[in-house]
Amino acid sequence: MPELPEVENVRRTLENLVTGKTIEDVIVTYPKIVKRPDDAEIFKEMLKGETIENIKRRGKFLLLYVTNYVIVSHLRMEGKFLLHQEDEPIDKHTHVRFLFTDGTELHYKDVRKFGTMHLFKKGEEMNQMPLADLGPEPFDAELTPQYLHERLQKTNRKIKVVLLDQRLLVGLGNIYVDEVLFRSQIHPEREASSLTAEEIERIYEATVTTLGEAVKRGGSTIRTYINSQGQIGSFQELLNVYGKKGEPCVTCGTILEKTVVGGRGTHYCPICQPRI
């Protein structure tokens, strides 16, 4: 699933490609992707004649701002936005097409069909689901060690489960939580309330640093991720633990292990990340 670094790179590349383009028509071949309004036909009619003004990101969501509305899109596992010419072949996994007046088309492709789109009037999007309950952005001033400390001390859930909760902070998924906890030297099954202030400080620093580095490297291409210009990321070359079960730890040489935490495959070093 694309996490914050991947979605941010999609945002940047997509904004360069489609800002200023006017939507002439919308073709939806898999209506279940459109969650709001309930009728995909209404979604299509509302967007006709709208011009894309800019594209923002909130956590793992893309926000496409047009003249009067905002399209809130979640890519889920395999979603991709790619720009095409009108005469190019249409991939069988293309489920939404935004046809522009200049003859180009923005295609939303999704092999798994898990992605979603919500359409809101401008100004309504942040106060309604799916954005209303999201926590702070990792790079915002609102996220501080003190913020994390106050919230982590109130829950006995395992720290990995807590960090995956987008209500605490946004953007972390399975890949980057494993990497953050390795850099923090925290076992993924530690109870959040057991963490010291110093350990929480390490988690904060590792979160900001890891995500920042991953954004600069274009994200991580583990399976099929590409940005909207068709480019892969390179941060996968710097991963320390994710997907590396059975390999030696880069720090101590111990063989890395994999377990399941909160239903998610979890990679860690049993020596560098002791379960106290």
UniProtKB/Swiss-Prot annotation:
Zinc-finger is among the record's keywords: yes
GO MF: 8-oxo-7,8-dihydroguanine DNA N-glycosylase activity; class I DNA-(apurinic or apyrimidinic site) endonuclease activity; damaged DNA binding; zinc ion binding
Keyword Zinc: yes
Reaction equations catalysed: Hydrolysis of DNA containing ring-opened 7-methylguanine residues, releasing 2,6-diamino-4-hydroxy-5-(N-methyl)formamidopyrimidine; 2'-deoxyribonucleotide-(2'-deoxyribose 5'-phosphate)-2'-deoxyribonucleotide-DNA = a 3'-end 2'-deoxyribonucleotide-(2,3-dehydro-2,3-deoxyribose 5'-phosphate)-DNA + a 5'-end 5'-phospho-2'-deoxyribonucleoside-DNA + H(+)
Catalytic machinery residues: P2, E3, K60, R264
Enzyme Commission number(s): 3.2.2.23, 4.2.99.18
Cofactor(s) needed: Zn(2+)
Family: Belongs to the FPG family.
The name this protein goes by in its record: Formamidopyrimidine-DNA glycosylase
Natural source organism: Bacillus anthracis
Encoding gene per record: mutM
